[in-house]
Amino acid sequence: MANKSMETIVSLAKHRGFVFPGSEIYGGLANTWDYGPLGVELKNNIKKAWWQKFVQESEHNVGIDAAILMNPKAWVASGHVGNFNDPMIDCKSCKARHRADKIIEDAALAKGDEIIVDGMTFDQMKETMIKYDVVCPDCGKADFTDIRQFNLMFKTFQGVTESSTNEIFLRPETAQGIFVNFKNVQRSMRKRTPFGIAQIGKSFRNEITPGNFTFRTREFEQMELEFFCKPGEDLEWHSYWKEFCKNWLLNLGMKEDSMRLRDHEDDELSHYSNATTDIEFKFPFGWGELWGIADRTDYDLKQHMEHSGEDFTYIDPVSNDRYIPYCIEPSLGADRVTLAFLCDAYDEEELEGDDKRTVLRFHPAIAPFKAAVLPLSKKLSDEATDVWAELRKAFPVDFDESQSIGKRYRRQDEIGTPFCITYDFDSKEDGQVTVRHRDSMTQERMPISEVKAYIEKHLQF
C-alpha cells in the first residue's frame, strides 16, 4: 500500500522537479509555488487535454483569452466588490487568522460529522462552534473574535497615481471576461444556442488561510467553460456537463473511487442557481473540491446588461424567440487537478527480493515524458541519440545514459514515464529496440521505425 501522505507527495514533487517553493533563495514567499521542468509539462498536458475535449473536439464550444485587468465596473456588476467574501475569525490568544467555515468543518469532521457551513449565518456558525468545541488549530485555545467578512479581491492601481479613481482589481475568476464578451463571440463566430465559450487563465484571490501545497493558493489557474442554452433546457445541460466532466477525469486515468459527485442542497445554492454539483477528490488531507458545475441561470448576463446598458438578448434565427440565455459553468482549477492527478498516480510497489519501487502511474497523455531512450552502454550513445532526436519531434522524450539500466528504469518510473526504449548492441544489427512498459514492467521487441506510432497510439484518451 502506497504511503500517500502529503509529505511524501510534496517531497517527491520537489525532488523530481515537479514543483519548487516560490522565491526559495530569498526564504520563499508563503503559499507560492513554481512549477519545475516536469511539473510544467504535466500541467500543460492536462490543460491541452482539457482544451482538446472541451473546445477542439466540441461542436458547440469556442475559446477566448480575456484580459486579467478589467474595468472595475464589471466587478461591481458581478457582485464581487460587494459580496466576494469569506468569513474570517481571529484567535485572541495567538493572533492567528482563520476561515471560520473551515475550522468549523474540520472540528466537526474530527468528531465524525461531515457538515457544510456554506450558507450559514454568523449566528449559526457561532452555535456550531460551541456544539463542536472549536478551538484554534494553532494554539488550542477557544478565545475568538467575532466572525466578520473579508473581501478576497486583490486591489491595485492603474496609472502613475494611487487614488480611488485609479483603483482596479486582479481578477478573482476568468468567467467575467467571458460574460462581457458574450455578444462579441456570438456575433463574430455566428454561434447559435446552445454554445459555449472556454478559457484558461490565471486568477487571484487573497485567501485568508491558503494551504495544502498547491490545493489552495492566492495565485492560481482556472479552466472554465460558460455554456449558454435556452431557458428550460438548463437542467438537462447541467446533467450533461456533470457526466462529461466526470468522464474526462476517468478517461485520463483517475480512479473512480478517488472521486465523488456531491449535489448542493437547496440551502447551499446561490440565490440565482438552479443546481450546482461539485466533483470532489480524495486528497491525502481529505476530500476537496476539484470541479464545480453550476447552473447560473441568466444571472450574469442580466447583471452586465443592467450595469453596462448592453443588450444581451438572444434572438433565435429559426423561431424568432427572444431570451436571455441560461448558463452552465463547469469551473476547474488547473493547479488542483494537477495535484489530484499527481496524488492519484502515486504508488509504491513491492517487488521480488524485498525490492520496491516508487511509480507515478500517469495516463500517457498527461505524463511529462512519453518515453525515455536508454542506451545499454555509453558506446551506443551516438546511435541512441539519433533515435531520441527523431522521437522528440513528435512528443517529449528523455535521454538517460548514466548508471545501470535497472536504476534508470527506477528513475523513469518515479517520474511517470510510460515507456523506456532500450537501445542495445543488437539494435545496430537488426534495427530493433526493446520497449519496457512502466506499469507492468513487461518488455517487447519492435523495429525502431514502429516505435513512434506505437507510443502515439497509447496517447489517445
Curated annotation (Swiss-Prot):
Compartment list: Cytoplasm
CDD domains: GlyRS-like_core, GlyRS_anticodon
Binding, ATP: 205-207, 215-220, 289-290, 333-336
Binding-site positions, substrate: R99, E173, F220, E221, Q222, M223, E224, E329, P330, S331, L332, G333
Family assignment from sequence similarity: Belongs to the class-II aminoacyl-tRNA synthetase family.
HAMAP family, per database record: Gly_tRNA_synth_B
Record's protein name: Glycine--tRNA ligase
Organism: Lysinibacillus sphaericus (strain C3-41)
